[in-house]
Structures are given as C-alpha cells and as structure tokens.
Amino acid sequence: MDAYEYGELLKTLSKKMENISNIVKPDELKKRLDEIEEMQQDPNFWNDTANAGKISQEKTRTERILETYHNANDAVYDAIEYFEMAKAEKDEETLEMLYEDAETLKERTNALEVQMMLSGEHDSNNAIVSIHPGAGGTESQDWASMLYRMYLRWAERHGFKVEVLDYQPGEEAGIKDVSFIIKGENAYGYLKVENGIHRLVRISPFDSNAKRHTSFTSVMVSPEIDDDIDIEIEDKDLRIDTYRASGAGGQHVNKTESAIRITHEPTGIVVQCQNDRSQHKNKSAAMKMLKSRLYEYEMAKKQAEIDGVEKSDIGWGHQIRSYVMQPYQQVKDTRSGQAFTNVDAILDGDIDKLLEGVLISQAK
C-alpha cells in the first residue's frame, strides 16, 4: 500500500462513517441510554419483570452499538490526523505503521455495519433452524447432516446453547430432517441470512465409481417468538397428524404415537416434533415452530410488497450458496459474491465472515 491508496481508503471510510452516523444517530442513542438509566433508578422498575428485562436488553444492545460506533469513528479520525501529520513530516516509519493497520481499520467499520444490521426487531432473538435434504437419497441426507454439524459448531464457537426439537436420521447415513433452536444473543440476526438452498459439489463417498455428485439441502431460519406477540392461528387451518417417533429412544417411543406433524394449510408450512416422549410437549414445541415460521413468512411477504417482488419469489426456495469440494475447493455466496477457499474450516463452523459479508451486502 502507498500514500495514494491509503488516502483513498481513508476517504471511503470517512464517507462510510458519515453515512453510518446519520443512521445510528449516536446523540439520540446516548439520550435513550440516559432515559433507561433514570428508569432503572425507580424502585418500582423491577415490579414488571418482563418489561424490565426487555428494557435491560435494549440498554445492552444500545451500549454495544455506541461502543462499536465510537471505536470505529475514533479509529478513522485518528488515522486521518496521523496520516496528515506523517505526510507533512515525511515520517516514513509512522506511514508504514498506518499502512499495516489498514486492514484492522476496515474491520472496525465492518463490525459497526454488522452491528447496524443486527438492530432489527427480532435480531437479538434465539433462532429456530430447520434443515431438509433435497432429492438424492443418502448423498443429500449426508449433506444435510454436514450442514447441521456446521451450525452446531458455529453455536459452540459462540458459547450458544442448542435444543433439538426434531431429529430424523437417514436410513444409511445423514439425516432426513432436523429442527433445533440456537439460543444466544443475536442468533437469529446472524442466521437469518442462511434461509435458502445450499448446494454441495463433491465426489460422493457413497458412489463406488467415485463420481462427482451435486446435492441440495434447504435451510429455514425463523426467530423464536415471545408468547406476548400475537400470531393468529385458527384451528380450522391446521391439520395435525400423530405418528410413531423414529430412531433411537427405547421401546416406549416406538409403541406410542407421540410425534406430531402440523400442516398450516393456507401457507403449506409443515412443522414436526418428536423430541419428547410426551405428545403434549411435542405439540407445544411444534406450535412454537409454526408460530415462528408464520411470523417469518408474514415479514417476508411484507418486505416483498415493499420491494415489489412477485409473491411466487417469497420463501426459502432460492439457492444462496455453493460449497465445492472437488475438483477445487470453494464456498461462494450468491448474494455477497464473496468466495472462500477454506471449505473445511467453514464446514467446521467458521462462518462468521460468510454471514457478515451477506449482512453488509444487504445493507448497501
């Protein structure tokens, strides 16, 4: 990097910070923080624990955005000041230090952009994730299990908890279906960009001729919705089927029709749960999944109306990412256009840069 390139980078980052400042409105956020702190001084504040909890979460999010904003803003304007001084004094050592720090400077502004993209109404919620293999039998089912492991490892890296709602193993390998909740701050905000079709290209370990296969698996992500959010679900719109749970679980599981499948006929959304031996608990978990999926569906429909997208384009039916393992190694996201060669690390849950790249591209 030379002085011209670094100067252009500073112009870009300075303009970006100006735009972000207009959106973030740091003075208004600081004012809101002061209001919350004043509210928390009131002895009656904690009488309504649910409301107090929400306001405390808002405070934490606001503090995080402000801290990230000030860190990025200070770093950019300090760099501009040092750059001008070093140029004037022909201080080559300081200039080299600034050039070396350019990547860190970009990462700070990127972190701020990501924080902004995680400020949606339900971005801080837990995420309900469902993975369904496409046609292709064992190969697709194995691909579904690879994606399942990827998300579990991602959750583990972040210290998030995972609760399995429904797990149906494949006959030979992999999984036929899995639904689970990832519990942690901004789990939905990050994983909402995973909605869609994931494509795998590799030499199949299940093909004795060692031919290359292409497999598809759909991933659906919706926010875990609080009980106080009203989602209207009419009984007449539901078809509820019970069946025997598959897979391990002992004799009791196989004798009792404890597994539940609920179909919401107006939208065609299907959810199922067989995680518990209690049919009542499985039905409760399935209804929670349905509520979240319907909420996500309605939000997507509203956004589509704003964007002028055809109704047929709404949903989870679009290919969003390709994972190529042979003849070369590459993961490419169709929305951000970013390509990565560290396929093994990504499949081991190292997906933050992937997710953040999509979040930032959607902000533009």
From Swiss-Prot:
Keyword Zinc-finger among UniProt keywords: no
Q: Which residues cross the membrane?
A: none
Does DNA repair count among this protein's keywords? no
Q: Which SMART domains match?
A: PCRF (SM00937)
PTM per Swiss-Prot/TrEMBL: Methylated by PrmC. Methylation increases the termination efficiency of RF2.
Tell me the keywords, alphabetical order: Cytoplasm, Methylation, Protein biosynthesis
Which classification does the entry list for the species?
Bacteria, Pseudomonadati, Campylobacterota, Epsilonproteobacteria, Campylobacterales
Major localisation: cytoplasm
Q: Where in the cell is it found?
A: Cytoplasm
Q: According to the UniProt entry, where is the signal peptide?
A: none
Its family remark reads: Belongs to the prokaryotic/mitochondrial release factor family.
Where N5-methylglutamine occurs, the residues are: 251
Tell me the function of this protein.
Answer: Peptide chain release factor 2 directs the termination of translation in response to the peptide chain termination codons UGA and UAA.
Any one Gene Ontology MF annotation carried by this entry is: translation release factor activity, codon specific
Q: Spell out the InterPro entries in the cross-references.
A: PCRF, Pep_chain_release_fac_I, Pep_chain_release_fac_I_sf, PrfB
The name under which this protein is listed is Peptide chain release factor 2
Q: Which domain of life is it from?
A: Bacteria
Provide one Gene Ontology cellular component.
Answer: cytoplasm
